[in-house]
């Protein structure tokens, strides 16, 4: 039975991971959980899974969590009360918890960077759903992986698809995603994208896009932030950078293809020009399960793919004029160094401002581009962790100040990186 820690247990990835644990009680057990502010759901998870440790991102909420557990009927309380910790240090304790064999990193955004690094430094295998870890800090994370021997297993559908395709090659042992060096025999990656909430909209109509429009995904059930990223195609741009670090390909050999049906989750072209693809219904539990069970596969009762039911699969190239965030991500990835961290932080803050209805949907790429342009003179090619954290905070502050002024440019001197 594999012992797992779930970082971000009350979020989309976390709840689906725990559903899998429920489906396979003889295969997995939960030893640690971390959460944000959803204490009601966390209490239910503690009751059901009885972890050894629980960590809250906000340490101030620990007394309330303890009160909620103490208020339970004695018959509903966990057999043994878990150890409870809080704050950033508490998250890192959960990420490196001694009895955990695999850590599922479901914390959204750059907030997941330090806990993920803690898991890597502790030598834990990771089911990586927090793509921002590699995007913002790939130059920092990859050397740590080499030192610790941790294995990265991608928990998002696209990179899981690539990983699964590579398991069938003679070089499967090199596809463990722990070095960042080019994967032998791999010529090209094609990341498929649903096109998001606005795939059938004209570019001119995006001026009228609302938060409700942007958070209504046609195929996938995801959190609000990632659903907005899907609508702007920033999510796919971030995945391009992640694929660059995971599989070692140059950006010119990583492509995005709009595939509205979301049946093909990604494709790889090998050196002999053959193309391998992984197919399935759009269900995040499938790539998460593969992370948990790898290198084995577990039989499931889940819905099986019937291509005659699908009927047809269609593909088209994304329009860069409609999806400027995609182009910004490619540019940041090619610039390298601290630029992806700035781009990612600016996007996270811009999306947060959009969800609060302080800016319009089309303002998101404007503020991201402004932050990236302002950072160019201070770009660091080979950053350390402190450098990444510093530029991350600078970009967030710059976007907030820009939005508060209602300007389209980020004024003032850049914070030295």
Swiss-Prot record:
Q: Where does NADPH bind?
A: 10-13, 36-38, 130, 132, 223
Name the catalysed reactions: 2-C-methyl-D-erythritol 4-phosphate + NADP(+) = 1-deoxy-D-xylulose 5-phosphate + NADPH + H(+)
Which terms does the record give in the GO molecular function aspect?
Answer: 1-deoxy-D-xylulose-5-phosphate reductoisomerase activity; manganese ion binding; NADPH binding
> Which terms are listed as keywords in the entry?
Isoprene biosynthesis, Manganese, Metal-binding, NADP, Oxidoreductase
| Species for this entry | Synechococcus sp. (strain CC9902)
Pathway named in the protein's UniProt entry: Isoprenoid biosynthesis; isopentenyl diphosphate biosynthesis via DXP pathway; isopentenyl diphosphate from 1-deoxy-D-xylulose 5-phosphate: step 1/6
Q: Which residues bind Mn(2+)?
A: 156, 158, 239
Highest taxon above the source species: Bacteria
Q: What is this protein called?
A: 1-deoxy-D-xylulose 5-phosphate reductoisomerase
Task performed by this protein: Catalyzes the NADPH-dependent rearrangement and reduction of 1-deoxy-D-xylulose-5-phosphate (DXP) to 2-C-methyl-D-erythritol 4-phosphate (MEP).
Enzyme Commission number, as recorded: 1.1.1.267
């Amino acid at each position: 039975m594999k012992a797992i820690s779930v970082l971000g247990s009350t979020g989309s990835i976390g709840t689906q991971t725990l559903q899998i644990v429920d489906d396979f009680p003889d295969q997995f057990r939960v030893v640690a959980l971390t959460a944000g502010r959803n204490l009601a759901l966390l209490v239910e998870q503690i009751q059901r899974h009885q972890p050894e440790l629980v960590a809250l991102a906000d340490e101030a909420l620990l007394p309330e969590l303890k009160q909620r557990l103490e208020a339970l009927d004695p018959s509903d309380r966990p057999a043994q009360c878990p150890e409870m910790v809080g704050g950033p240090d508490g998250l890192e304790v959960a990420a490196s918890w001694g009895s955990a064999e695999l850590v599922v990193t479901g914390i959204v955004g750059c907030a997941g960077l330090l806990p993920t690094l803690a898991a890597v430094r502790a030598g834990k295998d990771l089911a990586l759903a927090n793509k921002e870890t590699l995007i913002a800090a790939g130059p920092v994370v990859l050397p740590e992986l080499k030192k610790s021997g941790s294995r990265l297993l991608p928990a998002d559908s696209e990179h899981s698809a690539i990983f699964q395709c590579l398991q069938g090659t003679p070089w499967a042992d090199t596809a463990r995603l722990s070095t960042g060096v080019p994967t032998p025999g791999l010529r090209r990656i094609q990341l498929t994208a649903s096109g998001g909430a606005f795939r059938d909209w004209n570019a001119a109509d995006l001026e009228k896009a609302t938060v409700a429009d942007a958070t209504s995904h046609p195929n996938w059930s995801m959190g609000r932030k990632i659903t907005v990223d899907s609508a702007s195609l920033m999510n796919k741009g971030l995945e391009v950078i992640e694929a660059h670090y995971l599989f070692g390909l140059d950006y010119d050999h990583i492509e995005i293809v709009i595939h509205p049906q979301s049946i093909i989750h990604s494709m790889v072209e090998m050196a002999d020009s053959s193309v391998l693809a992984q197919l399935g219904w759009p269900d995040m539990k499938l790539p998460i399960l593969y992370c948990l069970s790898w290198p084995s596969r577990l039989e499931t009762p889940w819905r099986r793919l019937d291509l005659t039911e699908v009927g047809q699969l269609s593909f088209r190239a994304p329009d860069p004029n409609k999806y400027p965030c995609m182009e910004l991500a490619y540019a940041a990835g090619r610039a390298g160094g601290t630029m992806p961290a700035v781009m990612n932080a600016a996007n996270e803050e811009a999306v947060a401002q959009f969800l609060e209805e302080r800016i319009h949907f089309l303002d998101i790429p404007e503020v991201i581009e402004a932050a990236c342009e302002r950072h160019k003179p201070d770009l660091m090619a080979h950053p350390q962790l402190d450098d990444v954290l510093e530029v991350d905070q600078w970009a967030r502050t710059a976007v907030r100040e820009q939005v508060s002024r209602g300007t389209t440019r980020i004024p003032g001197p850049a914070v030295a990186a």
